[in-house]
């Protein structure tokens, strides 16, 4: 995880060095300058314990071992101090996963707040402690939580320091245009470049910026697909 943080920091330094060259190259510090606001943490819990599986069945009304839809989306624990959520996709997810194993994805938006069962912030917790907090919120009896978390789950936590950097507060000009004025062999691609009307956090956004860059720099006479006007489309609004 330290390696992930270092990579993010190095990218931010690189982007800042580029931005120094011209005001039209944006302000990357708006997106990578406050890790306390842009981070959240997730964990993968693997278990085959029948007590835990039974609690999952009660919540989802489905058997997670059938290979069919399980949670059908994200399950949010709205009374969680961490704002903890979890989901189970169709099992098995991995080639080497055993047939009786279930993989649960758990994440939290508030990593700096003490938990309800584990009185520590998520960012300071081990995988076992994160599991204990999750078991508490799915209704496992309190006197069974620690033993189940320690001996019947294998949990891998992952801290993502820049996961919501896309959504940090910004102003016009903080994201550079795909092809800044005057550029003939240089363009910005991806989620931190500015393209009209579209919304970041989608693959389409990144693809659209790449198309704009290639068509614009190479003089390709081809239109970039329009952004779907869902905000004004009654079919979507309904």
Predicted regions and their residues:
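Single conserved hydrophobic/aromatic residue that forms the stacking wall/gate
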Residues: 1-8, 12-15
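Conserved flavin/dinucleotide-binding core of flavoenzymes
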Residues: 21-238
């Amino acid at each position: 995880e330290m390696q992930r943080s270092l990579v993010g920091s190095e990218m931010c330094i690189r982007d800042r060095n580029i931005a120094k060259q011209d005001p039209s190259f944006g302000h990357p510090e708006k997106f990578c300058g406050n890790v306390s606001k842009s981070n959240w943490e997730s964990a993968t819990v693997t278990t085959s314990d029948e007590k835990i599986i039974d609690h999952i069945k009660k919540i989802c009304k489905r058997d997670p071992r059938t290979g069919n839809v399980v949670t059908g989306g994200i399950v949010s624990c709205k009374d969680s101090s961490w704002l903890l959520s979890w989901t189970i996709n169709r099992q098995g997810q991995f080639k080497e996963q055993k047939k009786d194993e279930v993989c649960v994805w758990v994440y939290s938006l508030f990593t700096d707040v003490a938990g309800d069962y584990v009185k520590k912030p998520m960012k300071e917790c081990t995988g076992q402690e994160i599991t204990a907090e999750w078991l508490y919120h799915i209704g496992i009896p309190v006197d069974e939580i620690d033993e189940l978390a320690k001996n019947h789950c294998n949990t891998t936590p992952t801290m993502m320091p820049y996961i919501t950097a896309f959504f940090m507060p910004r102003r016009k000009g903080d994201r550079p245009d795909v092809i800044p004025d005057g550029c003939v062999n240089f363009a910005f691609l991806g989620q931190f470049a500015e393209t009209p009307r579209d919304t970041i956090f989608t693959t389409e956004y990144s693809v659209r910026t790449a198309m704009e860059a290639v068509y614009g720099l190479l003089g390709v006479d081809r239109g970039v697909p329009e952004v779907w006007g869902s905000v004004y489309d009654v079919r979507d609004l309904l």
